[in-house]
Amino acid sequence: MGDHNLNVQELLNLFQNLGIPRQPNHREVIGLRMLGGWWGPGTRYILVSIFLQDDSGQPLQQPRWRPEGRPVNPLVHNTIEAPWGELRQAFEDLDVAEGTLRFGPLANGNWIPGDEYSMEFQPPLAQEIAQMQRDELEEILDITGQICAQVIDLVDMQDAQIRGLERRIQDRLGLRDNLPVAGIQAPPSSPIGQPIASSSLQPIPGSSSSPADLDGIWTPRQIDPRLSRVAYNPFLPGSSDGSGGSIPVQPSAPPAVLPSLPSLPAPVSQPIIQYVAQPPVPAPQAIPIQHIRAVTGNTPTNPRDIPMWLGRHSAAIEGVFPMTTPDLRCRVVNALIGGSLGLSLEPIHCVNWAAVVAALYVRTHGSYPIHELANVLRAVVTQEGVATGFQLGIMLSNQDYNLVWGILRPLLPGQAVVTAMQQRLDQEVNDAARITSFNGHLNDIYQLLGLNARGQSIARAQSASTSGNSASAGRGRRGQRTQQQAGRQQQQQTRRTNQGNQGQRDNNQRQSSGGNQGQRGQGGYDLRPRTYQPQRYGGGRGRRWNDNQQQQQAQPGRSSDQPRSQSQQPQPEARGDQSRTSGAGRGQQGRGNQNRNQRRADANNTRNVDTVTATTTSSSTASSGQNGSSTTPPASGSRNQGD
């Protein structure tokens, strides 16, 4: 049938007249129950959905309504009951539904005796049949025939029951002429209620005939025990024969008249055929608890963590095992929480997942006063996010949107989110619509700003995960990583050794040009960071026995006549030598050191000199240089470079 115009104001008037304390929502499905119209006095139904917004969430200038191709179920759908003319003012071009859908709950032909909607069924009249197509008419006649057949069967069954009751009444009235004694029939001539004198009753032997001359059928053993409760029973032996009865007979008293017939035994009731068979009780659906636990994990041991745990995994649980009824959701929740003491829920608490979380939260945390709601929601937002905090706040505050929004607004991640949320929420028609669409708006804004569900930056999370993956190694690669680290450390040690040797050569080269650097004064200092600290400070690399030999090989043409400036900082090797001498020896110029190095070079040509020997020689040379003048020739055995 397509879309049609909707008059929202008339729809609101219908809601108010029917006592519905709310406003219609976007995409709400409503059942219309039309009480009479152009088709006649019968009741007809149609299921419609209303549209108040477009796809972007903006209000429509002209709201629309659209018929749904489903039957109306008043027990499930929100149903509006009014005459067809009044409903047509709100829903333009309103008409009955197509086919058998116009019968509403009876669209499938299931007529239930005693049901309100079944008892008001009216078959289509001539004016309604005239508007039907051939296929539609055949379908309606089929369903109408089924309903009429069920009604006829019910009438026949009730007629049989009425005839049975009449027969029982006639049988009971026919027994009023007979006394209810087992195995005996009263003479038809004796009227009911006629007094019988006790003196006429004589003891009857077993072989004699009955008082009614019934050929000896009756015997005292056949007395019905129920007759003993009668105040005066002439068929029991009297006190005259000495046997006595249940109640002594008083001869002087007049015979009592039977006021009524004694109660008859209940007749065997005829089986009543129930036409409408009760629907079979559906077998309880098996819950795949193992599959659900594979997604959610184990239940938290702390009961206070259970509500938020269920709230986080509600979507995953619905994905594994969809739940359509509160009863089924209640069974799943109780199975997950494992019957914890005091946490078992009823179906009334499991209308949706928000109600489940709210009920469990109140049970585990207690009922909070309203002035502490801000602290509760702040803790929930910090742990679970704004969306979860909003849902819980709505439940705990009894749908107070303004209170919850005022608490959560300062907790949003940034002014951009606050502005965007306020702009979108202001476009909603009322607080109920804002509550319904809050999470949708929040997720859209988070996605637009590049934030995750908790308002955190996605780029930061990705960088953190990338660094974490690069820092961590997979299982099975630990041995390979250890080997790589060992090889890398060995290469670094080799590289440092080579750099140390190269640094020694560079130091020797700078010593050869020390005179020129001394002339520059302070400008000649080497300001690069010192790799090794002097040994007098506890540092240093130590010396090898062949370090001097390597220095001489690297600098064979160094002259000993070039003076060194006292302001020049000694090199690491020279500092190593000076640390073993006295303070006066360290104050001399570099001429003595040059002669000492030359003497060691000549000595190394003939034999290997120990480090201790070289140190002793250098110490004695430095002492002799301190006692003498600067022009004193070196000790014997030393050679000048010019020689």
UniProtKB/Swiss-Prot annotation:
A motif (PTAP/PSAP motif) lies at residues 251-254. Residues 575-607 are annotated as: GR-box 3. Residues 515-524 have a biased composition (Gly residues). GO terms for cellular component: host cell; host cell cytoplasm; host cell nucleus; host cytoskeleton; viral nucleocapsid. Residues 633-643 have a biased composition (Polar residues). GO terms for molecular function: DNA binding; RNA binding. Residues 468-493 are annotated as: Nucleic acid-binding. The record marks R293, A294, F321, P322, N334, A335, D610, T611 as: Cleavage. A motif (Nuclear localization signal) lies at residues 523-544. The keyword Nucleus does not apply. Residues 523-544 are annotated as: GR-box 2. GO terms for biological process: microtubule-dependent intracellular transport of viral material towards nucleus; symbiont entry into host cell; viral budding via host ESCRT complex; viral release from host cell. Keywords: Capsid protein, Cytoplasmic inwards viral transport, DNA-binding, Host cytoplasm, Host nucleus, Host-virus interaction, Microtubular inwards viral transport, RNA-binding, Viral budding, Viral budding via the host ESCRT complexes, Viral nucleoprotein, Viral release from host cell, Virion, Virus entry into host cell. InterPro entries: Gag_C, Gag_N. Residues 180-219, 232-254, 460-643 are annotated as: Disordered. Residues 198-211, 461-474, 481-514, 547-572, 603-632 have a biased composition (Low complexity). Residues 31-54 are annotated as: Involved in viral assembly and export. Specific enzymatic cleavages in vivo by viral protease yield mature proteins. The protease is not cleaved off from Pol. Since cleavage efficiency is not optimal for all sites, intermediary molecules are expressed. It comes from the Viruses. It holds the Pfam family Gag_spuma_C. Gag protein contains 3 glycine-arginine motifs (GR-boxes) necessary for RNA packaging, the first of which has nucleic acid binding properties in vitro. Involved in capsid formation and genome binding. Shortly after infection, interaction between incoming particle-associated Gag proteins and host dynein allows centrosomal targeting of the viral genome (associated to Gag), prior to nucleus translocation and integration into host genome. Foamy viruses are distinct from other retroviruses in many respects. Their protease is active as an uncleaved Pro-Pol protein. Mature particles do not include the usual processed retroviral structural protein (MA, CA and NC), but instead contain two large Gag proteins. Their functional nucleic acid appears to be either RNA or dsDNA (up to 20% of extracellular particles), because they probably proceed either to an early (before integration) or late reverse transcription (after assembly). Foamy viruses have the ability to retrotranspose intracellularly with high efficiency. This is Gag polyprotein. It comes from Simian foamy virus type 3 (strain LK3). The gene is gag.
